[in-house]
A protein has these predicted regions:
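Phosphate- and other anionic-substrate recognition elements at nucleic-acid/protein interfaces
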Residues: 1-109
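Single conserved hydrophobic/aromatic residue that forms the stacking wall/gate
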Residues: 110-116
Length: 116
């Protein structure tokens, strides 16, 4: 099974693709979609959406794993991340990917225990 893992954001969206077979994870690809703070926010959302669509098309994952949104003290930041997360989920849904949501703590533990 090929899994695309996403750490959502609107400035930087981290992503990694792993192949899972026979109780083993193998890294396939990784990167980030970065947006420029100097452009309008709606343009940044478009860049996130387009970037994630390109990653999905290029890496052909079977499922998407994404961090759940958690409350931050800065409401402006949490709203922006929620909006970016929305366009990421849209790209995944349009590609027909099942979506699995995890807490940041669990996904960090999973990623670090299988990192190479």
């Amino acid at each position: 099974m090929r899994v695309l893992g996403i750490d959502p954001g609107y400035a930087i969206v981290g992503w990694g693709v792993v192949e899972y077979a026979g109780n083993r994870f193998a890294p396939v690809d990784f990167g980030a979609v970065c947006t420029d703070a100097g452009v309008p926010f709606e343009r940044r959302l478009d860049e996130v959406y387009t970037g994630i669509k390109e990653v999905i098309e290029r890496t052909q994952p079977e499922v998407l794993a994404i961090e759940k949104l958690f409350y931050q003290h800065n409401q402006t930041t949490v709203i922006g991340v929620a909006e970016a997360r929305g366009v990421i989920l849209l790209a995944a849904a349009q590609a027909g990917l099942p979506i699995y949501e995890y807490t940041d703590r669990k996904s960090t533990r999973l990623n670090s225990s299988h990192a190479t």
